[in-house]
Amino acid sequence: MNRIAFLVCSAVFLITAQIQAQTSINKPKTAQVMGKQTIYQFKVQDLSGDTFDFSSLKGKKIMIVNTASKCGLTPQYKDLEAIYKEYKDKGFVIVGFPANNFASQEPGTNKEIETFCQQNYGVTFPMMDKISVKGDDMAEIYKFLTQKSKNGVQDSEVEWNFQKYLINEKGELVKVIKPRTLPTDPEIISWIKG
């Protein structure tokens, strides 16, 4: 009798374990469900105060760059505008975010920034409202760009003005490019064309 009870208990245990194992294989992990978000959830203000909805960029490759008017890297505006003009009709867009986080190199108002960009570099790519890209007052979009728990790819820190974030056609972060890397770098151009 004890042997039969043992066999029945063993069979029930094995069946229960098999069902639990199968359920855990088919059930996505919490990190996967909560993990990777996309850029399309964000709405921000542009330099004119109008709403800019990132969902309007679905299907395009996006370069997000934090900018400054009084930085040694400010001449990158010229290259940014050049690649924007060359590839904007081929599914690519640049979105600039002025930020005053590094040595107070973007002290101007939105209007002053807009005038500076147009007069000095002929900027036509979308430029957003001045935000913070670091610290306690970091904008939500930059939390997405810099936190693996939100972007599902990597943690990063904005090192300086003109750091670039490459977003694929699905709205997912794919690469972070250092500030000193020029927008015309072969790796970036290859990614745009790919």
Q: PLM features: residue spans?
A:
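Short, internal strand/loop/helix patches
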Residues: K111-W160
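Thiol-/selenol-based redox modules, centered on thioredoxin-like
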Residues: E140-K143, Q147-G194
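Amphipathic alpha-helical repeat scaffolds
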Residues: D46, N66-K70
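Conserved helix-turn-beta segment immediately C-terminal to the redox Cys motif
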Residues: K60-I62, K70, T74-P98, C117-Y121
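Bacterial Sec-dependent N-terminal signal peptides
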Residues: M1-N26
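Thiol-based oxidoreductase modules, predominantly thioredoxin-like and allied folds used
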Residues: G91-G108, T124-G135
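N-terminal "domain-start" segment that seeds a small globular fold
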Residues: T23-S55, E140
